[in-house]
Amino acid sequence: MDFVLNTIQWLREVPHNFKGEFATVVFDDSADILVYCCVLYILLVFMVPEHIMKNREPFNLRLPFVFWNIGLCLFSFCGAYSCVKNMIALYWERGFYRTTCFFDSSVAYDGEFAFWVFYFILSKIPEMIDTVFLVFQKKPVIFLHWYHHLTVAIFCWHAGHALIPSGLWFATMNYCVHSIMYFYYFMCACGMRKFIRPIAPFITMMQLLQMVAGTLIVLYTAYHSYLGESGCEVDRTSIRLGLVMYGSYFFLFAVLFGKLYLKKQVKPSGTASAYAMSKKRNGEKMA
């Protein structure tokens, strides 16, 4: 019992003892790791289905899928709790402009908030395993799915290297959405799709609203960087990348939402049909 209590106490202390120098070293000295992961991911999406899985039976990965989703759900919930708590305090103390445009190293470089933002960035690489489940179960991998995983990993790594203050908002929003999204996938994987299915449109709407909020935040930083008198510490490369990323996400999620929930069709066609059927049957990833 003492071991369990000591372990829990240790886990509580780890985020508070986090030092930003460690994150700086990772992002400065390990950029090539991101490149390797992205190359392997592209091979997974485009080569494995055609050259490895083409003549094979799909793997039964239901049990690993259950544990994978509950693990990501708990991770996202803990991250959401910490980031929301710290974001509210930061906003209350500094206001929206200073929170979004100026990096507060005393809050976002060391300690609990920095810990969860750092591991949020790193988590975008293992989250690519979502696609592994699709590929090896011979489920369709639509453009939105792999494009989202690939580009968000690249942008987050760049944002971690550049220490953009607006990234605190992005991490907080993403943790919140993912905590609900992965719980939904967990329930579906456990065979409770009929029970949980009614909230599927709500989750897609949350994702869409996240893209709207992200786009507005990037536009806000762009205004203060290019036109505002006081400026903005978000570098302009991050602003341009953010506009392209969030703008494209908004468009793609809006199209997906329209196809899945607004168009009343008996039998949708194309990749949207395959994706919708896959998601209905197996609770697979929306993005």
From Swiss-Prot:
- Catalytic residues (positions): 148
Task: Identify the residue span(s) of motif HxxHH motif.
Answer: 145-149
InterPro entries, per database record: ELO_CS (IPR030457), ELO_fam (IPR002076)
Enumerate the subcellular locations listed in this protein's record, separating them with semicolons. Answer: Membrane
Keyword terms, alphabetized: Fatty acid biosynthesis, Fatty acid metabolism, Lipid biosynthesis, Lipid metabolism, Membrane, Transferase, Transmembrane, Transmembrane helix
- List GO BP terms, alphabetically: fatty acid elongation, monounsaturated fatty acid; fatty acid elongation, polyunsaturated fatty acid; fatty acid elongation, saturated fatty acid; sphingolipid biosynthetic process; very long-chain fatty acid biosynthetic process
> Which stretches are transmembrane?
33-53, 64-84, 115-135, 150-170, 172-192, 199-219, 241-261
Which cysteine pairs are joined by S-S bonds? none
Q: What does this protein do?
A: Involved in the synthesis of fatty acids. Elongates C16:0 and C18:0 fatty acids to C26:0, with C24:0 being the main product.
The family classification in the record reads: Belongs to the ELO family.
Please identify the protein, giving its name as recorded.
Very long chain fatty acid elongase 4
Source organism per UniProt:
Trypanosoma cruzi (strain CL Brener)
Q: What lineage does UniProt assign to this protein's organism?
A: Eukaryota, Discoba, Euglenozoa, Kinetoplastea, Metakinetoplastina
